[in-house]
Amino acid sequence: NEKTSSLLQVLVSIQAQILIETPYCNEPGHEFQNGTPAGDKYNKEYNDHTRFFVMKSTMLDLLENPDSYPQFTEVIKTHFKLKKDYVINICEKWISESTKYADQMKKMLDKMKPLLNKL
């Protein structure tokens, strides 16, 4: 409720519902699949799809176009400079776990590495 919820409550809700290993099972109508073989399969596919678009839209795009959001250019550059090794490691992990997007994700990471190293 926007009239009674604090920012902290919203952030805790996001953390509890989205930033978990199995966000698919938090989608309405899918809760009953949590912990089942079908739920595990759908979670893996959901995570694979989400990770692909995270790499594409929130990593590669921002590295290629850091001035897309002029008010955040320095924040974006500083974030990637400080987290460069972590970003590369997590992307490599995601690629190794991907069943559908591994080749595309590998190409994106190959584009990201020189951009990260320039920071």
Identify the function of each model-found stretch.
Residues 24-119:
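Charge-rich (especially acidic), low-complexity segments
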Residues 1-23:
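E2/UBC-UEV (E2-variant) core
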